[in-house]
Amino acid sequence: MYGPKNHGWIEVITGPMYSGKSEELIRRVRRVKIAKQKVQVFKPEIDNRYSNEDVVSHCGDKEGAVPIKSSEDILKLIKEDTEVVAIDEAQFFDKGILEVVNKIANEGKRVICAGLDQDFKGEPFGYMPDIIAVAEFVHKVQAVCMICGNPATRTQRLINGKPAKYDDPVVLVGAKESYEARCRKCHIVPKE
């Protein structure tokens, strides 16, 4: 995943909740710092589960981040000497995120995006499929199904312990109280 200096590219870390996406993003950011490269980390303001100003994995690892409202804010805040831009929870950003990550990569910077590829219905989530399509590197991670123990590729939303209905809102920020990892077979989305 390392190319020549001054050649930008996009890396995506994707999969369901509890698969280690933020943990992997944090690991890559730490390696960048060890290599003495300048890095900036961003996250959407809406992601305030564990911290307002850190990317935090479910296992407690954290890395400082700038919370932003809109993808355009990333372009306004990037410093000229920044070599690597890391973006967590990319699925929550507006349509402009695709143009933003392409612009940054085209300027010779490494872009690392982490986010859910599917929503709780098992459908493509936000603009993540678009980012995945233009990325040079895609790392799809799995969790463990909380029902059967098989590899989990989906996120099950639970409302009062029961699967959320298909027509429930797509965005509901939460953690263990409302979501769990499931495999294809154990993932349930009632139509009614």
UniProtKB/Swiss-Prot annotation:
Positions bound to Zn(2+): C145, C148, C183, C186
Molecular functions per Gene Ontology: ATP binding; thymidine kinase activity; zinc ion binding
Record-linked SUPFAM superfamilies: Glucocorticoid receptor-like (DNA-binding domain), P-loop containing nucleoside triphosphate hydrolases
The EC number(s) this enzyme carries: 2.7.1.21
Binding site for ATP: G15, P16, M17, Y18, S19, G20, K21, S22, D88, E89, A90, Q91
Catalytic activity: thymidine + ATP = dTMP + ADP + H(+)
UniProt record, GO biological process: DNA biosynthetic process; thymidine metabolic process
Bridged cysteine pairs (disulfide): none
Compartments in which it is found: Cytoplasm
Keywords: ATP-binding, Cytoplasm, DNA synthesis, Kinase, Metal-binding, Nucleotide-binding, Transferase, Zinc
Record-annotated active site: E89
CC terms in the record's Gene Ontology section: cytosol
Residue ranges of coiled coil: none
InterPro entries per UniProt: P-loop_NTPase (IPR027417), Thymidine_kinase (IPR001267), Thymidine_kinase_CS (IPR020633)
Keyword Cytoplasm in record: yes
Group of enzyme by EC: transferase
Source organism, top-level taxon: Bacteria
PANTHER family from the UniProt entry: THYMIDINE KINASE, THYMIDINE KINASE, CYTOSOLIC
Family statement drawn from the similarity comment of this UniProt entry: Belongs to the thymidine kinase family.
Subunit structure: Homotetramer.
HAMAP family from the UniProt entry: Thymidine_kinase (MF_00124)
Protein name: Thymidine kinase
Organism of derivation: Clostridium tetani (strain Massachusetts / E88)
